[in-house]
């Protein structure tokens, strides 16, 4: 499928965005742009600045990389707008109405709110343009930890204990007894461990809620789960097959300043190591892969997801699902599939073709 003069499929790589994961999105986009097969795909870069302006994107993937702990950002350039008219689907126009480019498929490499949460998926659904990855429902539910866990629990999947704070800052005594200490206080709709605190004494709880509320008015408080951190990727092929990657075991995640896997630990400090495949027994590996696929289906995901677990003495417990996981050079999702025999370039090809197949 292509309408381009080159005969190639035109992929609009949309990245950046208004979320606190803006820079991670930029690095993911740079890696994707560098690995899309140039024999099959023409890349149309579209950036979204931190204040929400849609602009002509960076054409050089090398400029969207992490250099000396400096994360890239979308620069202010000439603005463009996506068409919402199905008769002009895939078109991006300059402010004067002239055409910037026409895409056959959208690859929304957006992490966090205003991108991974169903908003952009809904925007492009208005014009009937195919989009890589899950649709509106799965994206929205996957971003909101409250509803992720409600859907997983409804399917009988193993989850931890949590309490939601909407318009209050305190826990009741019953809730404190339910959760115990330590607890993790998180923005309910966030990622990359931004705004998260590990609380070991209740007198520190209000400060942690304030930090989380700086990123989301809704806060989730979770019991600490003691166990190994394991991740598993899920990939859907154009023919509908859903497969799980080999899992990855993360080590060193407690090295962050707060005693957990925080933003700097994930992307900057280079202290976390991953064993891929995870050194787990066959039964546990198969259970994690099965639970990952069940989680994918519970949220009605399409295309891809990364599912995060704690493996405890009593078995795996689901932590969260990422409907647009990181694609940076150090991200677990592409690394797990590479170890499963699906190279980065092939992984991207499957994802784009799956989106196009859904459209057909």
From Swiss-Prot:
Note accompanying the cofactor annotation: Binds 2 magnesium or manganese ions per subunit.
Enzyme category, top tier: ligase
Biological process per Gene Ontology, one example term: regulation of cell shape
Gene3D superfamilies: 3.40.50.20, ATP-grasp fold, A domain (3.30.1490.20), ATP-grasp fold, B domain (3.30.470.20)
Binding site for ATP: 176-231
Subcellular location: Cytoplasm
Record keywords: ATP-binding, Cell shape, Cell wall biogenesis/degradation, Cytoplasm, Ligase, Magnesium, Manganese, Metal-binding, Nucleotide-binding, Peptidoglycan synthesis
Superkingdom to which the source organism belongs: Bacteria
Names of the cofactor(s): Mg(2+); Mn(2+)
Transmembrane segments: none
GO (cellular component) term, any one: cytosol
Keyword Zinc: no
Functional pathway: Cell wall biogenesis; peptidoglycan biosynthesis
InterPro entries the record matches: ATP-grasp, ATP_grasp_subdomain_1, D-Ala_lig_Van_CS, D_ala_D_ala, Dala_Dala_lig_C, Dala_Dala_lig_N, PreATP-grasp_dom_sf
Residues bound to Mg(2+) 2: 320, 322
Name of the protein this chain belongs to: D-alanine--D-alanine ligase
């Amino acid at each position: 499928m292509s309408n381009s003069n080159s005969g190639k499929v035109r992929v609009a790589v949309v990245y950046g965005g208004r979320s606190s994961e803006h820079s991670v999105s930029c690095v993911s986009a740079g890696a994707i742009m560098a690995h899309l097969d140039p024999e099959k795909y023409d890349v149309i870069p579209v950036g979204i600045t931190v204040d929400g302006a849609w602009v002509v994107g960076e054409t050089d993937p090398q400029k969207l990389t992490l250099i000396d702990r400096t994360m890239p950002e979308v620069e202010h350039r000439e603005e463009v707008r996506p068409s919402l008219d199905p008769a002009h689907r895939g078109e991006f126009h300059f402010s004067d109405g002239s055409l910037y480019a026409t895409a056959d498929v959208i690859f929304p490499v957006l992490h966090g709110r205003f991108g991974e949460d169903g908003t952009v998926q809904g925007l492009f659904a208005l014009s009937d343009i195919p989009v890589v990855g899950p649709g509106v429902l799965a994206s929205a539910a996957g971003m909101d930890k409250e509803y992720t866990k409600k859907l997983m629990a409804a399917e009988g999947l193993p989850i931890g204990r949590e309490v939601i704070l909407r318009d209050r800052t305190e826990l009741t005594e019953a809730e404190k007894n339910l959760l115990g200490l330590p607890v993790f206080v998180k923005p309910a709709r966030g990622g990359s461990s931004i705004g998260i605190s590990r609380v070991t004494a209740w007198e520190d709880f209000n400060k942690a809620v304030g930090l989380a509320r700086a990123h989301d008015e809704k806060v989730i408080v979770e019991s600490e789960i003691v166990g190994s951190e394991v991740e598993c990727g899920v990939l859907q092929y154009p023919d509908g097959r859903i497969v799980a990657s080999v899992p990855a075991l993360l080590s060193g995640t407690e090295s962050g300043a707060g005693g957990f896997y925080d933003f700097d630990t994930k992307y900057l400090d280079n202290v976390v190591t991953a064993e891929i495949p995870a050194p787990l027994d066959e039964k546990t590996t198969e259970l994690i892969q099965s639970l990952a696929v069940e989680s994918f289906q519970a949220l009605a995901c399409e295309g891809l997801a990364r599912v995060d677990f704690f493996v405890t003495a009593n078995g795996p417990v689901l932590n969260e699902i990422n409907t647009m996981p990181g694609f940076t050079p150090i991200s677990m999702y592409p690394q797990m599939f590479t170890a499963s025999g699906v190279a980065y370039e092939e992984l991207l090809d499957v994802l784009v073709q799956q989106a196009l197949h859904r459209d057909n």
